Amino acid sequence: MLKSRTKSVSELFGLPDPPATGRERLVATAIELFYRRGFGAVGVDQVIAAAGVTKTTFYKHFEGKDDLMVAAVQRRDEWESHAWGRAVRKIAGDDPIKQLLAMLDVMDLWFNDADFQGCMFVSAAAEFPNPHDPVHQAAAAYKQRTRDHRRDLARAAGAESAAAETFADCYTALIEGALVLRQMNGRNDAARVVRPAVEQLIATYLPQRLQEKQQAPNRRLKTIG
């Protein structure tokens, strides 16, 4: 776990690059408004006004709100995937097991951040429940990618293919449950609540790797002796 609680989400995540073009301003503004108010509550005119661009600029880049919503979800996906990966590596380095646990440390910081407004991808899927809707598909693509990343870490830690798939599904269910616990029940400690279950998953599906870690200090002591 994090040794210091002084690190903030912004310190770990970093800030998105400032938008340089009219299209980027529109997308960045849409992300902010959709995240805070919801997709259905924000109209195109509000985004245009907040972005400080003209309607001509908007329709030069987007056919309408649907296109903007998809672009916003996809851009949030790109930034968040990079930011989370960087934050986890800052804590855990390249060790896959440490990274799997560090994800909970980063999530704990996020859950306790003053700007926490829930998960934009969950909100997008909830507002657009049809699995064929482009907004739903963009949100689902992010969730699938994060699930697959956990599977890849399990494989890197020594899990067989089938075990890694099961591990990823179970870990993802715990993470999504923690999100619901935080967002609906206001439990700031939700990431810490699921941590013992994640540790048990690791012990169950990656026992050989854990055993190697536990034996390493003993081997060093024997070498020194």
Predicted ranges, named:
Residues 2, 25, 29-67, 71:
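Helix-turn-helix
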Residues 1-21, 155, 208-225:
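N-terminal intrinsically disordered/low-complexity leader segments
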Residues 98, 137-138, 156-172, 189:
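All-alpha amphipathic helical-bundle segments outside canonical DNA-binding/catalytic cores
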Residues 87-89, 106-111, 121-130, 153-154:
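Helix-loop "lid/cap" segments that line or gate small-molecule binding pockets
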